[in-house]
Regions:
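Basic nucleic-acid-binding interfaces
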Residues: 1-30, 34-77
């Protein structure tokens, strides 16, 4: 099974759009996405590589398992 690895922010951006999030705003280098059923926004820095911690934190907010995330990433590559 593939591992959760650091990821370029552009690929994570595509993932968020795939799961129904929309770009709300940007504050400095941080991109902020929202979805109507989420209690809080998805926030991540526009850095070359997002750490596993940032990805896992946002998956928790989205209520998406690591396995489901990896499955979706295989589809949108």
């Amino acid at each position: 099974m593939p591992h959760l690895t650091p990821l370029h922010y552009g690929k994570f951006w595509k993932f968020l759009e795939y799961v129904g999030c929309r770009f709300e705003r940007q504050r400095g280098s941080h991109l902020i996405y929202t979805r109507s059923d989420l209690a809080r926004p998805i926030v991540f820095p526009a850095k070359k590589q997002l750490s596993r911690t940032v990805i896992l934190s946002n998956l928790k907010t989205l209520n998406i398992s690591k396995e489901k995330y990896l499955e979706i990433m295989q589809k949108i590559k």
